[in-house]
Amino acid sequence: MREIVHLQTGQCGNQIGAAFWQTISGEHGLDGSGVYNGTSDLQLERMNVYFNEASGNKYVPRAVLVDLEPGTMDAVRAGPFGQLFRPDNFVFGQSGAGNNWAKGHYTEGAELVDQVLDVVRREAEGCDCLQGFQITHSLGGGTGAGMGTLLISKIREEFPDRMMATFSVVPSPKVSDTVVEPYNATLSVHQLVENSDETFCIDNEALYDICMRTLKLSNPSYGDLNHLVSAVMSGVTTCLRFPGQLNSDLRKLAVNMVPFPRLHFFMVGFAPLTSRGAHSFRAVTVPELTQQMYDPKNMMAASDFRNGRYLTCSAIFRGKVSMKEVEDQMRNVQNKNSSYFVEWIPNNVQTALCSIPPRGLKMSSTFVGNSTSIQELFKRVGDQFTAMFRRKAFLHWYTGEGMDEMEFTEAESNMNDLVSEYQQYQDASISEGEEEYEEEVPIEGEE
């Protein structure tokens, strides 16, 4: 039944992945070793979207864990849910990629990739009806970015008709982890534009802001950030894992969200965001959820949608929510903010409902938006890329692994094209299209 194979690559991907598995194990009533002790049949009904059933009422995540050094894997294995994963599904090298995209994509990563694909193949063969793949990784490093994109293109080759969703941590404007981040990110975006069906952009800085501003945490840890990401990942996949009134899956999401194949980079948000202690004091209503969900401060990527327009967006509500109320609220938002939605896609907001809320909440909503303002994010990376590339700074690390400067130029221009495509559709209006159409008609007649 509609299984998904999950891959996590690199340190960032493995940490987000671990948080995600912790979240959904909780939602499905599994303890740290995968034994089911839940209360509701609904938890079991579609367990097999993400879990394989083993003997003795035990469930094992359909996850492949990949890294080029053993450190992060050991940490996952030692963590609270480390006993959940199948031991054969840990695939790791010893050398590390050292934040070098070329090492992940061409040298070290390429040596390990066949081993990973064997595990992926084995997981895929065990599925009744494989729906697709999801991968968690960061775009700024070596393994998640370089090897992650290599895996995506290899899986694409072998399973061309399956969905490929990526949860990608993009470099943030102020907080930079490594100097060569702009290179790694640009090379990765170049790959994602071609090979991914939907990319959910997550950005550490936006997550920090949410933790500080909304959750009032004075010094948030990566654990807190990953917890936010896992809430969104769980929300996006709710409809697959629980029966709902209006269901959606990876493919339906893509069909509704991607008007043009290259423009598949989404902003995500989650509501209600309340600090850990505060949620028990107030009831959340659908209007509040909708309000909060569309608030720029809630977006997990550092671009403000008010600087662009939504091509499409999708909202997934969970809990005991009235269908009518949700539709009224969503229509309301669209009418009030009509200038932020392109008018040439008339019904560009999609809603899905699922009756089972996340743990500890009565209702929640997850927001996925395809906004032209995501170009800010690519522009920023592009500017940093250009600044360094003009001086050929740090290039020897990449050319030393057998890369060519040509490849950098290609990646740069592909990302610039992406930015201008977003801009083109942001500026497009209905009337333009009609005028062009009228001009074209007589030409056909002349022939």
From Swiss-Prot:
Source taxon at top rank: Eukaryota
Keywords in alphabetical order: Antibiotic resistance, Cytoplasm, Cytoskeleton, GTP-binding, Magnesium, Metal-binding, Microtubule, Nucleotide-binding
Gene3D superfamilies registered for this protein in UniProt: Helix hairpin bin, Tubulin/FtsZ, C-terminal domain, Tubulin/FtsZ, GTPase domain
Sequence ranges of Acidic residues compositional bias: 432-447
Annotated residues for binding of Mg(2+): 69
Keyword Protein biosynthesis: no
One of the GO BP terms on file: microtubule-based process
UniProt: GTP binding residues: 11, 69, 138, 142-144, 204, 226
UniProt region (Disordered), positions on chain: 425-447
Cell location: Cytoplasm, Cytoskeleton
Keyword ATP-binding: no
Cofactor(s) demanded: Mg(2+)
GO molecular function annotations of the record: GTP binding; GTPase activity; metal ion binding; structural constituent of cytoskeleton
GO cellular component terms, A-Z: cytoplasm; microtubule
InterPro entries membership: Beta-tubulin_BS (IPR013838), Beta_tubulin (IPR002453), Tub_FtsZ_C (IPR008280), Tubulin (IPR000217), Tubulin/FtsZ-like_C (IPR037103), Tubulin/FtsZ_2-layer-sand-dom (IPR018316), Tubulin/FtsZ_GTPase_sf (IPR036525), Tubulin_C (IPR023123)
SMART domains the UniProt entry points to: Tubulin, Tubulin_C
Pfam family, one: Tubulin_C
The protein's assembly and partners: Dimer of alpha and beta chains. A typical microtubule is a hollow water-filled tube with an outer diameter of 25 nm and an inner diameter of 15 nM. Alpha-beta heterodimers associate head-to-tail to form protofilaments running lengthwise along the microtubule wall with the beta-tubulin subunit facing the microtubule plus end conferring a structural polarity. Microtubules usually have 13 protofilaments but different protofilament numbers can be found in some organisms and specialized cells.
Annotated function: Tubulin is the major constituent of microtubules, a cylinder consisting of laterally associated linear protofilaments composed of alpha- and beta-tubulin heterodimers. Microtubules grow by the addition of GTP-tubulin dimers to the microtubule end, where a stabilizing cap forms. Below the cap, tubulin dimers are in GDP-bound state, owing to GTPase activity of alpha-tubulin.
Family: Belongs to the tubulin family.
Listed name of the protein: Tubulin beta chain
Species this protein is from: Botryotinia fuckeliana (Noble rot fungus)
The encoding gene: tubA
